[in-house]
Amino acid sequence: MANYFNTLTFIEKLKHLGKCRFMSNNEFSNGIQALLSKKVAIIGCGSQGLNQGLNMRDSGVNITYALRRESILNKQESWARATRNGFPVGTYDEIIPKSDVVINLTPDKCHTSVIRQIEPLMKHGSTLGYSHGFHIVEVGEKIRQDITVIMVAPKCPGTEVRQEYQRGFGVPALIAVHEENDTYDMGMTLAKSWAFALGSHRAGVLESSFVAEVKSDLMGEQTILCGMLQAGSILCFDYMISNGVNAAYAGKFIQCGWEVITEALKQGGITLMMDRLSNASKIRAFILSEKLKNILKPVFEKHMENILNGVFSKEMMLDWENNDSKLLKWREKTSQLPLEQAPNYQQEILEQTYFDYGILMVAIIKSGIELSFDTMIKSGIAPESAYYESLHELPLIANTIARKKLYEMNMVISDTAEYGNYLFCDKVVPLLKKTIIPNLRTGDLGMSPKNVNVDNIVLRNTNDMIRNHTIEKVGIQLRSYMQNMKSLSFN
């Protein structure tokens, strides 16, 4: 099999990368109708598998789990999750031949093996669903022509897919039909019903392509969504400790600070996040952000280049063949970080304190979002896709860190995201330790900032540059469709 993206012509690549259309609410007026009469099987009961199944069942879809025979016989975790939640469970041989729609929500590394087992069992004219296009685009799997291939990709980990649904809202999603596999012209109808069943129609759905989803998703998760949060957590915690801050307090400040600060992004983008700072702190955060962008721009661009040309995927798949040697080494290294070992801090930290004492964290968030967004746009990815992958999903990832630090984030994101996160951190942490950390001022993190005079012209220009960035203009439009988005309360 050959990387699908690399087989396309230059013009075809641009067409696939740029495919993006925001779908109106009335396009989902039929709800789950297209799935009501269908037997839907989900393969895999991990974070995405379980939580998508719960949402779909609550929306009225008939869901069954198809699991490996060994998983059922040995009562492994996937079997336990499905049965504990009252779902019917069966083997591939028992479930797949009867299913109209088969949704493959196993890890990327398992897809080739899974498809080899289930494709001969799938009935003529059935549908195969994915929530990430890696297997189609990067591995280059060719699916039987009579099978319709669709994708609904929620823009967050599975845990947040469920939590946002239970709040009466949902998470944005990209949906797509693989144009090589839509013989009956039914793919989009089924994808819309699936997205509706997840609750994504309440948050915003983009009609996209498998290519655009994969390339933007890989870029977002490697850089701002996971990579910058992990690198920032390591750097900020170590800096606070080196300045005499209590380890328990520093641990809670970092662990919960990302969630508190990024919650402002959901309601008002970078502008609102920066407005939570004092005028002097806003100017300082802006200056730090610009320095970070100048230093990190080549790193972001190299990651995008390796995602587009397939180098990243090739290297990661080699690690799969080596029994995840690199991934497991990085995972163990992360578990031993001083931040992960820090004792719990029992006292409350007020919401505003995270902004007042977290100027560096705000700068890290701002720079990472803008760099990720700008790099994607330059590569041909549509602004709306880039927004979801760089800004909107960030608070949902930060929520996972607030639960159990970096361990929780890395457990609920995919192995693909986790691998890319570690790859990014290995470059960025030493780079910023040499360039940014030695030049921080008292008050940039963990301590009260100094009182300084504010120049009106500088403040005006700073506000203009924040508000006129393209991501802020795109964000205003996309957030206008999220009228029922639920806010988190911290104090």
Curated annotation (Swiss-Prot):
Active-site annotation: 132
Cofactor binding note: Binds 2 magnesium ions per subunit.
Residue positions binding Mg(2+) 1: 217, 221
GO cellular component, one term: cytosol
Pfam families linked to this entry: KARI_C, KARI_N
Limits of the KARI N-terminal Rossmann domain: 14-208
Keyword annotations from UniProtKB, A to Z: Amino-acid biosynthesis, Branched-chain amino acid biosynthesis, Magnesium, Metal-binding, NADP, Oxidoreductase, Repeat
Binding site for NADP(+): 45-48, 68, 78, 158
Enzyme Commission identifier(s): 1.1.1.86
Residues annotated as binding Mg(2+) 2: 217, 389, 393
Domain KARI C-terminal knotted: 209-344, 345-485
UniProt cross-references to SUPFAM superfamilies, sorted A to Z: 6-phosphogluconate dehydrogenase C-terminal domain-like (SSF48179), NAD(P)-binding Rossmann-fold domains (SSF51735)
Pathway in which the depicted protein is active: Amino-acid biosynthesis; L-isoleucine biosynthesis; L-isoleucine from 2-oxobutanoate: step 2/4; Amino-acid biosynthesis; L-valine biosynthesis; L-valine from pyruvate: step 2/4
GO terms assigned for molecular function: ketol-acid reductoisomerase activity; magnesium ion binding
Positions annotated to bind substrate: 414
Biological process according to GO: isoleucine biosynthetic process; L-valine biosynthetic process
Reaction(s) the record says it catalyses: (2R)-2,3-dihydroxy-3-methylbutanoate + NADP(+) = (2S)-2-acetolactate + NADPH + H(+); (2R,3R)-2,3-dihydroxy-3-methylpentanoate + NADP(+) = (S)-2-ethyl-2-hydroxy-3-oxobutanoate + NADPH + H(+)
UniProt function note: Involved in the biosynthesis of branched-chain amino acids (BCAA). Catalyzes an alkyl-migration followed by a ketol-acid reduction of (S)-2-acetolactate (S2AL) to yield (R)-2,3-dihydroxy-isovalerate. In the isomerase reaction, S2AL is rearranged via a Mg-dependent methyl migration to produce 3-hydroxy-3-methyl-2-ketobutyrate (HMKB). In the reductase reaction, this 2-ketoacid undergoes a metal-dependent reduction by NADPH to yield (R)-2,3-dihydroxy-isovalerate.
Family affiliation: Belongs to the ketol-acid reductoisomerase family.
Protein's recorded name: Ketol-acid reductoisomerase (NADP(+))
Annotated gene: ilvC
